[in-house]
Amino acid sequence: MSTPQTGVRSVHSGPVIALDAMGGDHGPQEAVRGAVRAVREHGLRVVMVGRRPELVRLLAEEDAAGAIPIVHAEDALAMHEGALASWRRPRSSVAVACKLIRQGEASALVSAGSTGGVVATSTVRLRTQQGIMRPALAVSLPTRPGPTVLLDAGANADAKPEMLVQFAHLGAAYARSAFGVENPRVAMLTIGAEPGKGNRLARKTAELLTAAAAQAPQAQRLDFRGNVEGHDLLAGEVDVVVTDGFTGNVALKSVEGAVRFTMDAVAEAMTSSTAAKAGSLLQRKALRELRGRLDSDTYGGAVLLGLNGSVVISHGASRGPAVERACRLAHDLTAGGIGEEVRSRVQSGARSARRQRLGPGGEEQPAG
């Protein structure tokens, strides 16, 4: 089966992953390494989008000349560029990858580029699902019972209460589809667990979520458990944590920093003396397993929910293995029908949320 616009035959089957090969702190070299791993080790179908001459050279250096199709894109988003870049750079690698999805030539986009630029470009070119105001970045946090979905993790610095209710439906649908949680427990991230805590946005959102939990039809009902605080994110007591993108991104970066500090401190303590070094030999396997569970690269990246297409945004500092995991995540979203199932589930939830915010006369109520 040949991939459109490339002429290169693929021996693999399954969805095509459009990889933005120009995004990320480390440039196309790590993207190429990740793509080669994804194809060789997992049989994924990947098409790299970027500057063809550079990608051809890098593929040859990996002994993979001609192994992965390339779609040329002459431009690229810089890591410092934000939302306006989506308009200024219509020929960027992200924009070209979105075009492949829109034309049915790819099923998902993976990028390690600027979060603001990727979110804006994919939103403009793929459009939001019917009834969805804005997409949300969903990150799976590792906990003992199972992953907790945090959203929004950075797509929308400012949000309205109605948007956060939609994010709750998106997150619950994702938890059901991706992790098999039959009735996801949803909570609001704020400064206190007691009802009424938080700013006006948090209080109004909690009010709407409480109403949705009580009044919506059973099939569309959210299991809203109230508020959680930052120290609850890794407790595993809820399945979905909802917040605005500013708060969510700060919370995510704080968790990543705390995990990194803890792992470094443990490693330092285990090698601080001869006795500790001897003991560390026994603990090394357990430490590697713990690092693997908590490493932000383990889950591949954040999933941009709410668009007409699957988008995975990996960490800007992603190396080859992280890019490969992001490609695997994008493959699972599409091959497993997770993306379509989320879209289907959230449509009914979006309609329910809209009914919740309409008054008796069918007029929009103020956000508070």
Residue locations for each model-derived region?
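N-terminal phosphate-binding or glycine-rich loops at protein starts, especially the Walker A/P-loop
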Residues: 2-56
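Glycine-rich phosphate/diphosphate-binding loop of Rossmann-like nucleotide-binding domains
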Residues: 29-30, 42-47, 52-53, 157-226, ...
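Glycine-rich phosphate-binding loop
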Residues: 100-119, 197, 202-291
